[in-house]
Amino acid sequence: MDKLLERFLNYVSLDTQSKAGVRQVPSTEGQWKLLHLLKEQLEEMGLINVTLSEKGTLMATLPANVPGDIPAIGFISHVDTSPDCSGKNVNPQIVENYRGGDIALGIGDEVLSPVMFPVLHQLLGQTLITTDGKTLLGADDKAGIAEIMTALAVLQQKNIPHGDIRVAFTPDEEVGKGAKHFDVDAFDARWAYTVDGGGVGELEFENFNAASVNIKIVGNNVHPGTAKGVMVNALSLAARIHAEVPADESPEMTEGYEGFYHLASMKGTVERADMHYIIRDFDRKQFEARKRKMMEIAKKVGKGLHPDCYIELVIEDSYYNMREKVVEHPHILDIAQQAMRDCDIEPELKPIRGGTDGAQLSFMGLPCPNLFTGGYNYHGKHEFVTLEGMEKAVQVIVRIAELTAQRKS
């Protein structure tokens, strides 16, 4: 398929890791490099209205090639890779005709094993693109970028009937800022799809409601030998707080539609401790109940403390479940499912145990479910993607454009 693998390998060669806790958007210079490269490529392909905002959102339009009042649709991917694992000097391995068993990742001890990742059993005979065991791969979401770019080329070269196709590439999705500076009005699509999913057939329109909880604990430190009745150990208070959080509602104990509390970081001394939790739940009422639970725990543990010692809790909502917005427009899912079936793929509707730019965009007036990329094991050195899965994603994008052209606004 037209330059698909070449594009992907080109994009992952650029280090575009985003960085949390940074004010500027994009948060890293590497993202600008990929955005400028993509802008140049879009212009070379002849797309119109190619714009790159000061906040790093790249937009372009492939004009309709058929007359009529056809709804404009969009496809969106993000240029950054996760801060969780290095994205510098990515050295992909190409494993053709995978025959099963362990795949050595580079020259070290790291392997990609079907024992740990049973999905490999389903991928026999396919071409796998893996890491060398030292970095992530960047299929999340450079596979999506390569697929969108290739689909644009296919639509042009084969003169497939389509309406206006908008594309956008966003920064800082992995640190939750990807959609904050997205101009929905300028994008001017009736609906869109993020291309940021996993295995072939995945179609996602439900995601977690998400919030962050930051807890500041101020204690009182004195010499341990004279501490009775005076010392207030902030670390002990932190331990008591975590002991009150339901242990069976953590990420490692939940799946499917189950929500969780996750202690993401904790640091401190006797004098001061800080805890950072994330809260996730698909159900809005349960989500609100989880936030109340954290407030109740903080009040309980902080009861009776000396006035100079205290527990401060700040809860900030991150994003909400896009289901309530997407289901108002069922044809968006119908078209995607039909496109998959037309490409001999059985759609797999499943909840996202996470979030996407599409979740925020759906609440900004742009309904935006998520399509598969063909990638697996994101955010780590065991990440990989199949070439066949990427090719299927291109076919689905093209077919969605074609099916939409058969509709009238």
Curated annotation (Swiss-Prot):
- UniProt-annotated binding residues for Zn(2+) 2: D140, E174, H379
Positions of the catalytic residues: D80, E173 (proton acceptor)
What keywords appear on the UniProt entry? Aminopeptidase, Cytoplasm, Hydrolase, Metal-binding, Metalloprotease, Protease, Zinc
Alphabetized GO MF terms: metallopeptidase activity; tripeptide aminopeptidase activity; zinc ion binding
Chemical reaction(s) catalysed: Release of the N-terminal residue from a tripeptide
Q: Which residues bind Zn(2+) 1?
A: H78, D140, D196
* PROSITE patterns according to UniProt: ARGE_DAPE_CPG2_1, ARGE_DAPE_CPG2_2
Q: What is its EC number?
A: 3.4.11.4
What does this protein's record comment on cofactor binding? Binds 2 Zn(2+) ions per subunit.
What processes in GO biological process is this protein linked to?
Answer: peptide catabolic process; proteolysis
The subcellular localization recorded is: Cytoplasm
Q: What is its main location?
A: cytoplasm
Its needed co-factors are: Zn(2+)
PANTHER family per record: PEPTIDASE T
Q: What does this protein do?
A: Cleaves the N-terminal amino acid of tripeptides.
In the record, the note on similarity to other proteins reads: Belongs to the peptidase M20B family.
- UniProt name for this protein: Peptidase T
The record lists the organism as Escherichia coli O139:H28 (strain E24377A / ETEC)
Gene responsible for this protein: pepT
